[in-house]
Amino acid sequence: MLKGIHPALSPELLKVLAEMGHGDEIVLSDAHFPAHQLHHKVIRADGIQIATLLEAITPLFEYDQYVERPLAMMQAVHGDSLDLAVEERYLAAIAKINGKAPLVERVERFAFYDRAKIAYAVVITGELAKYGNIILKKGVTPVLTD
């Protein structure tokens, strides 16, 4: 354990977050997502809800401020419905840490899969909500000055 690091963050996930550069994306997927089919770098976070991971990641992660919507979620397939409370829960988790949350882009299912294929990594979580996947785009970490 490290002081100040949320216990939901595994050493492997911390390493990946540190390796990512600005503009890189990471997928936090629900438990049903075809991660291993789409990507070679898959991290397991079994039993952990995405909102919990967002609370853990947000203090360490700069969301891209140079794009209008640095978060992306899958839109419902035609004829299906999604629970908007899922998005609200995710944004509340980020806002709890940052005071506000970035905007979310809704992406068609297969376009979402295409983005997942080129993401830096995919994290499989214990999230069970339908359409519960979210992509985070990393921004430029501010330089601290004396």
From Swiss-Prot:
Gene Ontology cellular component annotations, sorted alphabetically: cytoplasm
Keyword Isomerase among UniProt keywords: yes
Pathway linked to the protein: Carbohydrate metabolism; L-fucose metabolism
SUPFAM superfamilies found in the cross-reference section: RbsD-like
Keyword Cytoplasm included in the entry's annotation: yes
GO molecular function, a single term: fucose binding
GO BP term, pick one: L-fucose metabolic process
Lineage top rank: taxon: Bacteria
Location of the active site: H22 (proton donor)
InterPro entries xrefs: L-fucose_mutarotase, RbsD-like_sf, RbsD/FucU_mutarotase, RbsD_FucU
Pfam families according to UniProt: RbsD_FucU
Job description of the protein: Involved in the anomeric conversion of L-fucose.
Quaternary structure and partners: Homodecamer.
The family this protein is said to belong to: Belongs to the RbsD / FucU family. FucU mutarotase subfamily.
NCBIfam families, alphabetized: PRK15420.1
Protein name: L-fucose mutarotase
Organism in which the protein naturally occurs: Glaesserella parasuis serovar 5 (strain SH0165) (Haemophilus parasuis)
Lineage of the organism: Bacteria, Pseudomonadati, Pseudomonadota, Gammaproteobacteria, Pasteurellales
